[in-house]
Amino acid sequence: MSVPAGWEPVIGLEIHVQLKTRTKMFCRCANVWGEPENTQTCPVCLAHPGVLPVPNRRAIEWAVKLGLALGCRIADRAYFHRKNYFYPDLPKGYQISQYDSPLCEGGRVVVPLADRDLEIGIVRAHLEEDAAKTIHVGGATGRIHGADTSLVDFNRGGTPLVEIVTEPDIRSAEEARRFLQLLRQTIVELGISDAEMETGTLRVDANVSVRPAGSTELRTRTEIKNMNSFSYIARGIEAEAARQVAVWEGGGEVVQETFDFDAGTGALTPRRAKEEADDYRYFPEPDLVPVEPPAFFHREGPRHVRRSRRRPFSS
């Protein structure tokens, strides 16, 4: 499926990278995959009353390392915030994340294509904790729609994530796929994550809108989730772009919402209205002091990153 002639997609990506530190982001529980359900937990990651988080220094260092590889500015001081929402996989009722003072921001990535180099801006790369894993039992798709029962495995809850947010500089599904392949290669070479989409250590959401070719306007965007391979991401983007073109050409209005993409059928299933920052009621995390990246990274960071990788990102 391709985008109809006369239109172009406008695509931005949100990439979640699960770091392979030995312990979780704010507690001493082991950060391992494949253990029996709900065996890698403690009062901190289960949000028992009175417990306090303690940041994982290695996760902070690795997030800075990735930010440097993406050409980001590293903050002298960054803050953690509470991102408030109520899902069963979030026992505190909020996620510890970063809002207006991220660890890394303002990066730039050059992706070589067959006919040119594509420059993609990096808005930010920030640290946060992962939610638990929800398992939907029954139904045909393994998702909440039509499921008989939902189970929660808290082993994943609290594991360290870096979220990378790109500018909407991508204009095709193929450009998105190429960028993600190079990004994954970089992450693996840095040694900070396995970055495997099959196991969820690399997860990608795509924000998609369309506009008349040659236009500079930014129209209403939607978000696509649950795409677990680069080829599925490309197919999901193309399907959503084609759907939006049909809506606009039919005289309708695209609604800002979130979709699940079913790679088997090619169907896009509405999930919920897409949230904005105000919906999460961010406020500073009172139980954590500001993060001040080690002076080592400001002094030797770029050289350290070059020693950690076999080739620059843009090759």
Give residue spans per PLM region:
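Basic, nucleic-acid-interacting segments
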Residues: 1-313
